Amino acid sequence: MAQRASRRPAAAAAAVVVAVVLAVSGGVGATPETACRAAAEEDRRVDYEFCVSRLSHHHDSPDADTWGLAKVAADVGVCIAGDAAYDAKAKLQAAKAGGEREALERCAELYDRMGSAFAAAYDDINRREYAAGKEKAGEAASLARRCDGAFADAGVAPSPLERQTAESVKIAIVCTAITNLVK
């Protein structure tokens, strides 16, 4: 009987150690703050304040581990792209013919495609195909930059969608950096 009683504390201690190791290695308990801090340490392009602000407001963030927060970043990218496409189309209503109008039309198309790229990144990360997810996030950033390029080519400076482009690129960087943290 004494032998059995002495095994219980050892078994309980072993269970605690296993639980702690699994929690740390799986990212359980990750918060936007800790994930964004780690992402910023990994990639100096990560805007910590932006990262925390955008990820903290997502409904999936409170229960997410690092993998979940990578998906949250991709989903936030989908939302930002959708808002940017809406903004481009709204500005298009008031635009006169010419370079600015053509650039707005081009940007509306690019932002629609960017939303699809972020959605594909989400799906890839969800399937744990991290390289493909990061590639799609990079594609989304490239599409956003092409919007600014459309305005530059039209001789319109600054771009009336400069903020939307900047936020799109920032969330693509965040998505990639957090995905890099997933083990």
From Swiss-Prot:
Keyword Repeat recorded: no
Disulfide bond residue pairs: 36-51, 107-147
UniProt entry keywords in alphabetical sequence: Apoplast, Disulfide bond, Secreted, Signal
Family stated for the protein in its record: Belongs to the PMEI family.
Subcellular location: Secreted, Extracellular space, Apoplast
Pfam family, one: PMEI
InterPro entries membership: Invertase/methylesterase_inhib, Pectinesterase_inhib_dom
Organism: Oryza sativa subsp. japonica (Rice)
Identification of the protein by name: Pectinesterase inhibitor 8
Gene Ontology CC annotations of this record: apoplast
Induction data: Induced by drought and salt stresses.
Signal sequence coordinates: 1-30
Alphabetized GO MF terms: pectinesterase inhibitor activity
